């Protein structure tokens, strides 16, 4: 099946290559200030909200949590210098000597206050449901925090590394959020750029190395790439897949790409027709993922016909690899069984701001049409797409991201319908058995037993299809050779790479 018109793909590839014909002299810059080309202007940088990965990158410059990740992807101490498990439901975190950007010390009272805000009755925090699972937060002294959970949570230290769980000063001015990260937001031109300066009181000696970061939003991926080539920016995220070969061949630039991000579909399960698992499975079997990899990612990826658990994971189940295989005849059969033999008309939410989202939506539209599902595309800007998704104003939606961590509990964000509504997961779609198994998995400390639990969970998810995997994709940053110390973190942690701005430098 044709995926994108040949002429369009040729134009896209040509546009990607044109900027690399030569490297003109870069404009004058302030020494030590890195200019970063962001893929979109963040809808919000509220610390506990999930508004996309562009916002997450800025949050990782400004805020820090109790734990985080090193450049090797391993969990490491952050505001907490150590942590221990006292009992199955009790964890103790020892805080380091650190300051917030208002000059005040980070204390256990700030940690407790942060969790109280997240769990509040009117909170819209991404981790609200998880933090509401805390029985209590104790503060034996200024540098000791004891978190007592209602149920065992083996992954609690991993939760604390999330860029959605930074610790904020309890003395932050109303409507503001004072963090303890390496950079301070000093100015912004809404929709265009943000300027950050180093926090002189940062708790890591000698860091950050940069004298500042200027963040410029380039919604157009070709303009973002051209800005790197011309020297207007030093580093860009979301390198277009059609430009990766040209960047690799350019001696003035370097590409840092990893596999770990993925594309998938979510559904509005609060109403017909996608409240029926048979219809969702029909969608899963209607899509040729090889076509999708070629069309949207220029071959830099692979099909994903199961839950996004990578082969490198101890929790990977090889026999589920092709669970949602391309089988249009089966898709039609499932639709007929669900009472939709005459076809379905529905909408598909995506965004035109990211080429991969738009291209994915177009290919999915073509494949679904072949089995009788007629799709109308809705392609707003990213901020609108997030808002519409959060409100459930769609039938199906294209999503692309990475898991919250390399632990399978990180999949809860995408398939646990008991969590607060979010654009990253299906709307109004609750599968009680999945919620139960996810809870059992995070409560089990024996790894062999955890593997058995997550195997059953994946089997249920394949049957119920609360999300439909589409493709793994390569996720890249590109930079001038003068940039050092910035790393693309491995696997699912690629969107935590903003942590390494603290060690980045530019010549």
What do these predicted ranges mean?
Residues 201-246, 374-376:
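Ligand-site clamp/hinge motif
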Residues 81-124, 146, 227, 273:
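Aromatic- and charge-enriched surface segment that lines or borders ligand/interaction sites
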Residues 37-87, 116, 178-179:
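N-terminal lobe/hinge region of extracytoplasmic solute-binding protein
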Residues 84, 127-170:
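Surface-exposed binding/hinge segments that line
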Residues 74, 153-214, 220-222, 328-329, ...:
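Gly/Pro-rich hinge or "lid" segments in bacterial periplasmic/extracellular proteins
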Residues 370-385, 412-481, 505-507:
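Extracytoplasmic/peripheral linker and loop segments enriched in polar/acidic and small residues
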Residues 479-507:
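Long beta-strand-rich cores associated with HINT superfamily self-processing modules
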Residues 303-337, 354-358:
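Structural transition elements
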């Amino acid at each position: 099946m044709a995926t994108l018109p040949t002429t369009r793909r040729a134009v896209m590839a040509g546009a990607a290559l044109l900027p690399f014909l030569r490297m003109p002299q870069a404009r004058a810059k302030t020494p030590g200030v890195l200019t970063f080309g962001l893929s979109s202007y963040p809808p919000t940088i509220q610390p506990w909200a999930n508004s996309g990965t562009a916002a997450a990158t800025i949050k990782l410059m400004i805020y820090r949590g109790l734990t985080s990740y090193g450049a090797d992807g391993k969990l490491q101490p952050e505001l907490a210098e150590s942590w221990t498990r006292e009992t199955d439901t009790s964890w103790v975190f020892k805080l380091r000597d650190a300051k917030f950007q208002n000059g005040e010390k980070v204390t256990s009272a700030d940690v407790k206050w942060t969790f109280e805000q997240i769990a509040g009755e009117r909170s819209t925090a991404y981790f609200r449901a998880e933090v509401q699972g805390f029985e209590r937060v104790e503060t034996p002294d200024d540098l000791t925090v004891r978190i007592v959970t209602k149920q065992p949570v083996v992954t609690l230290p991993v939760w604390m590394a999330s860029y959605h769980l930074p610790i904020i000063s309890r003395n932050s001015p109303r409507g503001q959020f004072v963090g303890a990260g390496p950079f301070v937001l000093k100015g912004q031109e809404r929709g265009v750029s943000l300027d950050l300066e180093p926090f002189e009181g940062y708790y890591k000696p000698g860091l950050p190395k940069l004298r500042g970061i200027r963040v410029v939003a380039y919604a157009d991926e070709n303009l973002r790439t051209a800005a790197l080539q011309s020297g207007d920016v030093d580093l860009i995220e979301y390198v277009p897949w059609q430009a990766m070969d040209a960047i690799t061949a350019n001696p003035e630039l370097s590409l840092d790409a990893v596999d770990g991000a993925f594309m998938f579909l979510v559904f509005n399960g609060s109403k017909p027709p996608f409240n029926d698992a048979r219809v969702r499975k029909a969608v899963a079997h209607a899509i040729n993922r090889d076509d999708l990899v070629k069309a949207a990612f220029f071959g830099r990826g692979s099909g994903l016909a199961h839950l996004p658990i990578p082969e490198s994971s101890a929790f990977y189940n090889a026999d589920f690899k092709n669970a949602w295989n391309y089988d249009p005849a089966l898709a039609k059969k499932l639709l007929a069984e669900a009472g939709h033999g005459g076809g379905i008309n529905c909408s598909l939410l995506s965004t035109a701001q990211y080429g991969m989202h738009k291209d994915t939506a177009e290919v999915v539209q073509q494949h679904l049409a072949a089995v009788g599902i007629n799709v109308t595309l809705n392609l707003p800007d990213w901020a609108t797409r997030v808002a519409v998704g959060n409100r459930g104003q769609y039938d199906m939606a294209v999503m692309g991201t990475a898991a919250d961590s390399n632990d399978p509990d990180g999949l809860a964000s995408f398939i646990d319908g008991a969590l607060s509504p979010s654009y990253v997961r299906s709307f109004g779609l609750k599968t009680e058995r999945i919620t139960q198994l996810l809870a059992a998995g995070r409560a089990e400390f024996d790894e062999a037993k955890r593997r058995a639990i997550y195997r059953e969970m994946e089997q249920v998810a394949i049957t119920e299809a609360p999300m439909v995997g589409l493709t793994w994709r390569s996720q890249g940053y590109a930079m001038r050779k003068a940039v050092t110390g910035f790393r693309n973190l491995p696997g699912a942690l690629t969107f935590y790479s903003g942590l390494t701005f603290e060690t980045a430098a530019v010549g």
